[in-house]
Amino acid sequence: MTSEHPQMFPSQFETIAEAAERHDVTFEFVTGRLRVKPMPDGDHAEIVMWLIECCMTQRPDLRLYPGRRVLLSGDCRTKPDAVLSHRRAFAAQGEWSDPAEVLMAVEVTSHDPHANRCDREEKPVAYAKAGIPVFLLVDREAGAVTVFSEPGGGRYGSVVTLTHGHTVEVPEPVNVTLDTEVLKEFVR
């Protein structure tokens, strides 16, 4: 199955995803394929909380929303681990957020190799196609942080990867500096 021949219609996916959430299972629909998103573990939660603290300290005008669903173009529906947006950007919106409101999507890898491949390969393309300015990937398996920026033509023009322990500069419109030393505690 590809985006040219999806497994199902997006509306069918939305019905399945809504039912699954009631049973602690999260699905995503990326490039026309149904994906199971593993439930986050404690280390995952700590990384997301660390990012929330970093963003709130340096950019109090923005909010990092964990687990907000994003309606991407065509046959793509994702639930990033977090999205950075302006305060109240999602007020009066339903459960699926407009990607135009998202300044940065965040994914933290899990213990699932299929989900990790999706985070590393498919989601950068999906987020770039949607015009999300920055995609931040915290890769626990690789012990690295990758910042994707400058979306255009269905891909990110700038991709910078640094191992945990380095200072990571997240570019405009985010404009946040991350001291990733703490992430060494969470390498798998």
For every predicted segment, state its role.
Residues 1-130, 134-188:
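Gly/Pro/Ser/Thr-rich low-complexity, intrinsically disordered segments predominantly at protein N-termini
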